[in-house]
C-alpha cells in the first residue's frame, strides 16, 4: 500500500480529498457519543480530526479516546473541506501512532482553564505551545526575517559586533560585569560603536544580536536581555536615517500584515491600526513634545508638569504616542540627556542631532538613533565629561582620526516592536524566554 505523503497543517488544504500524514501533538479532545474530535497541532496550525466509532477499528477508537493532552503523535487520514472546523479542513483519521504519551498521573500542567501570569511564566517552556504564544513567536520571526530582507535589499552588509566588551557603550546604563580571565569586561549594551567601525569599511552595515542592561526596572517595557537590529551608514546625516527608519518600520508592518495575517487574527489584533501605517511619519521637535506634555498637564491628563531639559519617561512617551495613529518621530533632545557620542545641532548646541521613534497607541519608543559626533577633539571632551575611561575608547576615537566622515544610525528593540505590532500589554510575551529583574528561570 502506498504511503501517505507527509504534510504540515498549514498546507493541508493542498491535499483536499487525499490521504496525508501529519506529525504533531494532541492539542485538545472532544467526545460526543460515538464521535471523537481530536484537535492536533504541529507548530503551523490546528487541524480537527474526526473518528466515527462504526467506521474505525475498536483499537484505534480507544487509542484516540484515551490520549492525553500534548501527547506526541503521527496521524494519517483523509482530508476534506469543512467550514466549521479550525482552518477550514478536517481529517477523517485512519491511523495514529503515539510517539510519547503524557502520563495520566502527571498530566500536562497548562490546562484550558485560566492560569495566573506567574504560573505561566514558571512554565514558559510549555506555555509557548499555546496558540496565542505560538502566533506571537511566528510574528516575531517574521519581524526578524523582514528586517534582514529590508537591509539586504538596501545594500547593507550584516556585521556582527562582540557580545563581550571592555567598556560601556552608553555611560548612563547599568552593565552586567564579566570576569574575562582576570580582567573586567561587560555584556554588550549595544553593537553600535563597533558597527560604526565596520561602516567605515563597508559603507552601509547593520547588526542583529542580543543586548544586556542591568537596569532594575519593573515596567511593562523593560527586559534585561533583549535583541536589537542596528543599521549604521557612512556619509549619512540625521535626516537620512530618519527617512531610513520610517521606511524600515513601514516595510516590517506591511510584511507582517501580508505573511502573518492569520496569526494577527489569532491574537485578536485590530488590523486597521496596522493598516494605517505608512510614510511619511509625523515629526515633532523635542520642544514641541515638551509643549504637548505641558498642555496635557494643564488639562489634567498628566499628573506632573514636564520641564524642558528632562528625558521623556514611559508615561510621557505613552501620552505623546497615543495622540497619533502612526509612529511619531521626536528629534533634537537636549544634549545632557543623550549619549556622549551624539553630534550637537550646529544651529543650537544645547540639543543633539538625534531622534526617537514612538510607536502609536501609547507603545512608546521603538527606535532611537542619531548622527554621530564627527570631531575627534569634541568626542574626547565628551568622553571626559561623562567620566568614561579614555583608554577604553582609544579605538573608537581612531575612527575620527583616520578618515572620519559624517555617519548616522539607529537601533530598534525587537521586543518593543513585537509588543506594538501584536498589541501586547507586556514585553514578557515577545521573546521565547524573558529575562526580567526577578526572573531567570526557565
Curated annotation (Swiss-Prot):
Q: Which UniProt keywords apply?
A: Aminoacyl-tRNA synthetase, ATP-binding, Cytoplasm, Ligase, Nucleotide-binding, Protein biosynthesis
Q: Recorded E.C. number(s)?
A: 6.1.1.22
Q: Where in the cell is it found?
A: Cytoplasm
Q: Which GO terms describe its cellular component?
A: cytoplasm
Recorded catalytic reaction(s): these are: tRNA(Asn) + L-asparagine + ATP = L-asparaginyl-tRNA(Asn) + AMP + diphosphate + H(+)
Major location category of this protein: cytoplasm
Q: Which InterPro entries match?
A: Aa-tRNA-synt_II (IPR004364), aa-tRNA-synth_II (IPR006195), aa-tRNA-synth_II/BPL/LPL (IPR045864), Asn-tRNA-ligase (IPR004522), Asp/Asn-tRNA-synth_IIb (IPR002312), NA-bd_OB-fold (IPR012340), NA-bd_OB_tRNA (IPR004365)
- Biological process according to GO: asparaginyl-tRNA aminoacylation
Q: Which GO MF terms are attached to this record?
A: asparagine-tRNA ligase activity; ATP binding; nucleic acid binding
Q: Please tell me whether the keyword DNA repair is annotated for this protein.
A: no
Q: Name one Pfam family in it.
A: tRNA-synt_2
Q: Which family does it belong to?
A: Belongs to the class-II aminoacyl-tRNA synthetase family.
Q: What is this protein called?
A: Asparagine--tRNA ligase
